[in-house]
Amino acid sequence: MKDIYQVIKKVRISEKATMLQETTGELVFEVDRDANKIEIKKAVEVAFGKKVASVRTANYDGKLKRQRRSDAGRTAHWKKAYVKLANGETLDLV
């Protein structure tokens, strides 16, 4: 298993993530692309000391970006994890 600080890269804070946290108690993280659901669950439980009920993941391709006229590039691909805490567990990240 990877180090927990290599699995969880950062917390994703957006309007959608804030609404999810307020309504369903789900947290949204940007995680390592190679991390699986079991590693994400263990990393959140160890880092924050909370019990995790479920983890959903989504892979995102990097966007195409242009610099100057013809130099085309791409931003990095990344992975998002939606983590639902167990009943009675709360965590305020916002």
From Swiss-Prot:
UniProt GO MF annotations: rRNA binding; structural constituent of ribosome
Keywords: Ribonucleoprotein, Ribosomal protein, RNA-binding, rRNA-binding
Keyword RNA-binding (UniProt): yes
GO BP terms: translation
Entry GO CC: ribonucleoprotein complex; ribosome
PROSITE patterns found in the cross-reference section: RIBOSOMAL_L23 (PS00050)
InterPro entries for the chain: Nucleotide-bd_a/b_plait_sf (IPR012677), Ribosomal_uL23-like (IPR013025), Ribosomal_uL23/eL15/eS24_sf (IPR012678), Ribosomal_uL23_CS (IPR001014)
Superkingdom of the organism of origin: Bacteria
Secretion signal span: none
UniProt family annotation: Belongs to the universal ribosomal protein uL23 family.
Descriptive protein name: Large ribosomal subunit protein uL23
Lineage: Bacteria, Pseudomonadati, Verrucomicrobiota, Verrucomicrobiia, Verrucomicrobiales
Gene encoding the protein: rplW
